C-alpha cells in the first residue's frame, strides 16, 4: 500500500475460525480451484493488525493489487453472479465493475503508468464450455485449464486478447517499460503440469521463452528497473512438493 506501512490482502477469517473445506479438487481429469464466498479484502499494518476492511459484499472478493500511483485497487468479485474485475479507490470507495464477459477474470495487475490492466481469463465459448463453467461456479469452483492473457484500460475499455496459445496462460505482469508482459504458460507441456515463463509484446507479437526447466515456474514479477525478476518454482526441491522463490 502507499507509504509501505500497510499490506493489502484477502482473507476468509470472517467466515469462521477454521479454513474453508476444499473437497475434491479433481474432476474428469481436470484440476479445480475453489472460490470461497467468505473472502473479503482487508488492510493490515506490518504487525498484522487489521486497520480496515475494504469489501463486505456477499460472495468472493479477492486477488487485489494496488496501482503504482497508489490511487486505485483492482480485484476480482463474483457479487454480480460471475467472476469479474472491479476497481475501487485506495480507501475502498467507488467500487465499480469493469469487465462483463462470461468467464473467470482474475490475477490482474496495473501497468507502470497505472492506466492499463493485464489479467488472465477463461472466457468459455462453446455451449459445452459455458455449461461446465456455470455448473462449476455454482459449486464454488473453477477449472483453470484454459486461460489466455488480456489487457484493458482501467475503466474496462479497449479490451484486447494478447495470447492465443491454448491451455493455461496466467500470472501476467507488466515489464517496467509497459511494452511487454511476463506470464506463465503450459501450452508446450504434454502433461500440462510443466509451466514455463514467457514474455510477449503488448500487441501479442514477439513471444519469447524465459525458463526452460521442465518444472512449475509461475508468479513472475519484475524489479522496478526491469533488470531482475522474481518467480516461484518447484525446481531443486528434492522430489518434494515444495515451491520456492528464485
PLM regions: where:
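Residue-level detector of Asp-centered blade-edge/turn motifs that repeat once per structural unit
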Residues: 2-3, 68-69, 112-113, 176-177, ...
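Hydrophobic beta-strand positions that form the internal "hydrophobic ladder"
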Residues: 7, 73-74, 117, 181, ...
Amino acid at each position: 500500500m502507499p507509504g509501505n506501512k500497510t499490506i493489502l490482502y484477502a482473507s476468509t477469517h470472517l467466515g469462521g475460525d477454521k479454513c474453508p473445506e476444499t473437497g475434491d479438487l479433481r474432476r474428469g481429469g481436470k484440476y479445480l480451484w475453489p472460490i470461497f464466498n467468505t473472502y473479503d479484502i482487508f488492510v493490515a499494518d506490518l504487525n498484522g493488525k487489521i486497520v480496515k476492511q475494504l469489501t463486505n459484499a456477499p460472495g468472493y472478493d479477492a486477488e487485489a493489487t494496488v496501482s503504482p500511483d497508489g490511487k486505485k485497487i483492482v480485484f476480482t468479485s463474483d457479487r454480480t453472479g460471475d467472476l469479474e474485475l472491479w476497481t475501487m479507490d485506495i480507501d475502498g470507495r467507488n467500487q465499480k465493475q469493469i469487465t462483463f464477459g462470461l468467464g473467470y477474470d482474475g490475477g490482474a495487475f496495473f501497468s507502470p503508468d497505472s492506466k492499463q490492466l493485464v489479467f488472465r481469463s477463461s472466457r468459455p465459448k462453446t455451449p459445452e464450455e459455458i455449461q461446465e463453467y456455470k455448473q462449476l461456479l455454482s459449486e464454488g469452483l473453477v477449472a483453470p485449464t484454459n486461460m489466455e492473457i488480456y489487457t484493458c484500460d482501467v475503466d474496462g475499455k479497449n479490451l484486447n486478447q494478447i495470447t492465443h496459445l491454448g491451455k493455461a496462460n496466467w500470472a501476467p505482469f507488466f515489464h517496467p517499460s509497459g511494452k511487454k508482459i511476463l506470464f506463465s504458460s503450459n501450452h508446450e507441456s504434454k502433461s500440462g503440469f510443466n509451466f514455463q515463463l514467457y514474455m510477449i509484446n503488448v500487441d501479442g507479437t514477439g513471444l519469447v521463452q524465459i525458463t526452460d526447466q521442465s518444472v512449475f515456474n509461475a508468479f513472475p514479477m519484475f524489479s522496478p528497473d526491469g533488470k531482475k525478476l522474481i518467480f516461484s518454482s518447484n525446481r531443486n526441491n528434492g522430489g518434494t512438493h515444495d515451491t520456492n522463490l528464485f
